[in-house]
Amino acid sequence: SPRAVADAVYDALPNGYFAIEDVERTVQSSGMAEQYPGYAVGYKNQFKASYTHLPFDPRALFKFWFASHFKVFDTYMGGDKIGHFNDMGHRYYTRYVDALADGHASEQAHAAVLEFATHDPIFSEAGVLGYLSAGAYSNGDQAANYAGFLFYRNLTEPVALKGRLRSPLAVRDGPHWRLAEHVRPDTDFFAWFVSDHWDEALNPSDYDGLMRGGMERNIRERTALILWRYRDEHDRPRPREFFLRRAQDLRTYYGADYGHGGKADELLTIAEVCFPGIVNDDGP
């Protein structure tokens, strides 16, 4: 059954913690440094975190590592997104298929997933995984969770990814399942699940009052680096309008609600923080 396939794939993959640790070891390894000389394959500065303006880092009670930052399929992301994609994606999926099994239509089952994603006291960004442990509702995490949900659905059914309907990753072969022809190590099948929604600079978190001021200062101090990172193909800095449009686009997953949180005019977007003195009269 589709549920059995999804559970088998989930069980075959390392859990979120070990997956993140594996990636950390890889991107920080000497082998990666030799393969990409002159490049920082994974950037991490655990001694100057985004919360060091506080006398005590509140994440110390919950966080056991500081995830590196790296680029995958042209998207900047933190290593924690891998754990969100697999673990939380599977949680979303089980909620979805359980709702279907209870007789709910697909739209109702999807609504149940979003309710869990945005309001569960433990596993939502509004609860322990977000505001309580980090002082933030991470829209990047929400997007990775949702992409993982789409991945588990796409194992056995067509799913819209990046606005295009994609065929299943596995197909029936008599009584068994086998990988579809497009699922091969040398194809881009997995790139369809990774998007700029995972980039917490382009798709910022909604910070609580304790964190917001320090985060805004940290972003502003890094304005030159941020604008250089997102420069265009001619190495020119992009205009404010680019970041306005990008932030607006990333509020949904190509039109689908994935549980994005925060008012548009209150989020610490690049457009708002890195372009001081500009009146916001041309966009959200």
Whereabouts are the PLM-identified features?
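Alpha-helical transmembrane segments of multipass membrane proteins
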Residues: 125-126
